[in-house]
């Protein structure tokens, strides 16, 4: 059988829009003294306070310059879901604040005055302070070390992942020294450490440890070789691409 010929369907003509000749089209002129320009992001032209200006410059420099692997590993932080479950456990083991300590000491003093035996059981709490955390890692007492990604100067903690790996202690890098500080009633904290957990939390804690080991301890060799930075700005990238196009064009002409 011969193929059927397609029947052409007549395209519908769109009705022409009737414009009133009294209303003239006047395209906007956005030059000086002209119409107001459309709204756009002008944040790069704002005169920021010095502290914010330094933050912005530091961020740009980290993108432009080549960042060595030891520093670049602090850009690889724990993912949001795992960080949420980790902080839930850390908050369970917060150290006592001033009010709780005062109440405990008062109760202890009252018990001693009444001749009752005072409770001498040591509570399980999160350990903090860089020297204390380092000592616990060296003594192999630490079960998990949590390091902040934005410690300033970074030299304070840059060696800590290597020490944790050498002592085979699970470690992770999380966002926010202030978030770590909030756990231990401080403004900021460079590193936190857990030495043990209660029996009811052991199952959940072991799952978190497995995930952290897979993300950090097992990938240490990979992070040790990976440099960061070297990303140029949009203008610089455009110039480079234009140069490459010219070079490619000249090479093609020579070949012909």
From Swiss-Prot:
Gene3D superfamilies assigned: 3.30.1330.30
PROSITE patterns xref list: RIBOSOMAL_L7AE
Annotated stretches, region: Disordered: 1-20
Basic residues composition-biased segments: 1-15
Keyword Disulfide bond assigned: no
Coiled coil: none
Top-level taxon in the UniProt lineage: Eukaryota
Keywords: Ribonucleoprotein, Ribosomal protein
One of the Pfam families matching this protein, by short name: Ribosomal_L7Ae
GO terms of molecular function: mRNA binding; structural constituent of ribosome
Name of this chain's protein: Large ribosomal subunit protein eL8y
Organism: Arabidopsis thaliana (Mouse-ear cress)
């Amino acid at each position: 059988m011969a193929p059927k010929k397609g029947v052409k369907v007549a395209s519908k003509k769109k009705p022409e829009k009737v414009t009133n000749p009294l209303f003239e089209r006047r395209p906007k002129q956005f030059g000086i003294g002209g119409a107001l320009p459309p709204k756009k992001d002008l944040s790069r032209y704002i005169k920021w306070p010095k502290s914010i200006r330094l933050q912005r410059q530091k961020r740009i420099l980290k993108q432009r310059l080549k960042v060595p692997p030891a520093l670049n590993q602090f850009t690889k932080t724990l993912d949001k879901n795992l960080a949420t479950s980790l902080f839930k456990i850390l908050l369970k083991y917060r150290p006592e604040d001033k009010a709780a300590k005062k109440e405990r000491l008062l109760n202890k003093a009252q018990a001693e005055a009444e001749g009752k035996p005072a409770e001498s059981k040591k509570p399980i709490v999160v350990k903090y302070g860089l020297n204390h955390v380092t000592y616990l890692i060296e003594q192999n007492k630490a079960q998990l070390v949590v390091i902040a990604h934005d410690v300033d100067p970074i030299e304070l903690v840059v060696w800590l992942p290597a020490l944790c790996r050498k002592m085979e202690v699970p470690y992770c890098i999380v966002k926010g020294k202030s978030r770590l500080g909030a756990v231990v009633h401080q403004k900021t904290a460079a590193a936190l450490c857990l030495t043990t957990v209660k029996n009811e939390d052991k199952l959940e804690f072991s799952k978190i440890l497995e995930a952290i080991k897979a993300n950090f301890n097992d990938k240490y060799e990979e992070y040790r070789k990976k440099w960061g930075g070297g990303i140029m700005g949009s203008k610089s990238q455009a110039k480079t691409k234009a140069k490459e196009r010219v070079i490619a064009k000249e090479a093609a002409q020579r070949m012909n």
